[in-house]
Swiss-Prot record:
Family assignment from sequence similarity: Belongs to the prokaryotic pantothenate kinase family.
Full protein name: Pantothenate kinase
UniProt-listed SUPFAM superfamilies: P-loop containing nucleoside triphosphate hydrolases
GO molecular function, one term: pantothenate kinase activity
Annotated pathway: Cofactor biosynthesis; coenzyme A biosynthesis; CoA from (R)-pantothenate: step 1/5
Keyword Nucleotide-binding set for record: yes
EC number: 2.7.1.33
Entry-linked CDD domains: PanK (cd02025)
Domain of life from the UniProt record: Bacteria
Compartment(s) where it occurs, according to its Swiss-Prot or TrEMBL record: Cytoplasm
Binding positions for ATP per the UniProt entry: 91-98
Amino acid sequence: MTNEFLHFEKISRQTWQSLHRKTTPPLTEEELESIKSFNDQISLQDVTDIYLPLAHLIQIYKRTKEDLAFSKGIFLQRESKSQPFIIGVSGSVAVGKSTTSRLLQILLSRTFTDATVELVTTDGFLYPNQTLIEQGILNRKGFPESYDMEALLNFLDRIKNGQDVDIPVYSHEVYDIVPEEKQSVKAADFVIVEGINVFQNPQNDRLYITDFFDFSIYVDAGVDDIESWYLDRFLKMLSLAQNDPDSYYYRFTQMPIGEVEAFAHQVWISINLTNLQNYIEPTRNRAEVILHKSKNHEIDEIYLKK
């Protein structure tokens, strides 16, 4: 962290966990195991120490938003419309965004017992591989220009206005948008939007994605740690693809392990690290909260915007 983060309050794990009364996590060990990414590490102690205080903070932000909407309604002399509370979750590839997002979905649905919580990943807004090939940017997949940002902005606008929306589905197994398959996103009390690009600006700069967020989280870690987690995940994906010729990773199961490791390392250097340093990490100070992970995946520091 640099002077760029002077407008954040740095909070240790010990201090952060003391900001919320001790309660039993509202999920079981089995449920937690089922939602974590297969190369991630998280425990019920992490839920108690980190995520329950975070859910409480989100509750405060939601209440503040509702109070402001009510006051605006009085000022405008009209009834305020209920809108979903939208949470953006960003961070590098392989840093644990998906685990954080799925856990928040469970915690919010059980903290607000009558609330509905939708979870969306921005992978569905990647252009299909064929489109990327036609545009000559398949090697830039994951970079800002490989996303249909106008479609993402349109989705956020419709969700913000309480509409149901069908969006494309992306498969990491086939490494592409799944034809004819859609995720139906219903009007909800909470919508969590997770992806590497959720704090980035569209190229036309007419409207910022972050304008739609009521709360935002950046999952952070050291570059060397993220690289290690990425390579570990890549190799584990191979083990899952050994008997699945339809998987993108199947072709790598036919290669010597040394060649596979060299390929994965090159992908990390040329794509994921470049994307992280140039486009993802520079947006982290747009988050309300930064969760910093140590080498063993444990969150050791929290940065809260002042």
